[in-house]
């Protein structure tokens, strides 16, 4: 029966008190455990958003720069030219890492943002007047884009939302010379096999994503909407726009999707980039119903957007650092609270047990014996608090962190439920051995700190006075 | 080793209560021989407990000196004093002062823990001491399950744990009923008679004191007189009341019939 047994028995002697103190300590410890986790989660989601955004913008910029002479004409009603508008960019990716990385799949743009085409079909015969004989026009390429997907119903805030998630996008382009050879209508980054070429039919060029979806490779046959095609090559997407896109001959695509004579997009190439706006004006004048967007417009939109995201991200970063400051303050408060709880409890305990201390001194306990007895009790209690703190922290980290930390959402102007979802940070306290050890070490250290003075006082008690103490 | 266990010379103790000086002890001289059982008598406030605290190294005197086993304890630092307390002195308190969260055996083991005795040895000796005070069966009981008398026996066993040179008992019967009171004084007298344990007991109970060997009367911090108790007679085989021959084990004098040892009726 040593000093440890006595400490344990003393703690268990007043069960309710010990329980209350342990729970109070537990909450302080839980704050200490969950706040860093919350900060980390926010940092990670900001970082992943930053890298996703900058990757996306670079890719898009590159592909736009390659096609600066392009003018897209479509009947699209879904968006005015550019994919990144309004709610589309509320970035589910900021819902605390849970969606980070899944930031804005191209499907959310409704079939490819830079096709500009939505999927509103237009009768090709109505637009034969948009052709290479127009002033400053070098070529006109009719394109059919059809997005094939499935419905997904998600429940948020008690309401069901249905949206279509694209599995793949079929893009039919005229595989004729010289269009195929002279204009950027096919992907340039071929990673396996070969690109499509003039005269190809019954063959497809898959994206890397498509090969996974269909489970095929170069040389294999692939069945698309009931028809069999041969895979001649695989392209690595050059931007988010064509990640899901497979290319085939326009007539194949029209037949396959029952769109004979239909297209979704006219890609008009100007003689040179200086003529782009006059070409766009010409076409708009001819066909006011068409939505005409130049890649130059897109590029400047993109650049404007890049600047605005830059400042939004800067805001996010400053919020994160402000959050770190808040977190530090809260941790300091939690640390102080933990020490103070232990301090007052042990001070009270020492007073309460003055006679016992006197007795122990009378029968030969040294000051050090007594001090270590009380120190051990304080540290044991704190360790119990530490264990409870890890449990509470594990269970309530998201709640605690969202209660105690400022929210980070750089795109809070974007409306819609996804934005609301972004505020419920998915913060998790991962109970790793390191965390357990760190929490217990912190608990022990704070317990020792809080007990130091009361235990020292106990050790200095004069036995004769202690014995008189009532 | 000298015959005198405790030698008190010109001992004075003054307390300061605010601006008032209280002379608790003044010029006390007292010698206690090895194997003696001395009781210190006196009314409340006569300085009995102060004297005992100074003798037991719980308090320091204002002047004078105390030699405990030939060692002057009045000049010692707190660090040296706890060593003296754990090895030379055994305390018995009026309120027993057992630790409520330890059982009888564990309470008796406590002082042995201070001197670093191995656990098995502590346990063996604690059980032996509990048997000696008649509590072998109650060793694993916590204080709250023991009667007051039993608790005081545990406290006496605890005081004996480190084989101290002297037992200092502060009103050991003060909180006990008549029956337990006599059991305890009998136990102390027996320990003194049979084991030769030196005991100094403070009490204000005349009758209890009369069963000890020597009674010292303290009044206003001074020793006013001394008187022999029945235990002195028992040791000399002579009745202290009539002078008739008695044996140390006799409970009453064969000649005059007066009680030599405490009985329940007494």
Predicted regions and their residues:
Chain B
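Short cysteine-rich clusters marking metal-coordination/redox-active sites
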Residues: 239, 253
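Composition-driven, intrinsically disordered low-complexity tracts enriched in small residues
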Residues: 204, 248-251
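Cys/His-coordinated zinc-binding microdomains
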Residues: 243, 257
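Short Cys/His-rich micro-motifs in 6-15 aa windows
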Residues: 258-266
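Flanking scaffold residues of small Cys/His-coordinated metal-binding clusters
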Residues: 3, 234, 248
